[in-house]
């Protein structure tokens, strides 16, 4: 499953 958008973009 793909990572949560909030957590994924939060790491960027």
Swiss-Prot record:
Keywords: Amidation, Amphibian defense peptide, Neuropeptide, Secreted. One of its GO terms (cellular component) is extracellular region. It comes from the Eukaryota. The modification Methionine amide is found at residue 12. Expressed by the skin glands. This is Hylambatin. Tachykinins are active peptides which excite neurons, evoke behavioral responses, are potent vasodilators and secretagogues, and contract (directly or indirectly) many smooth muscles.
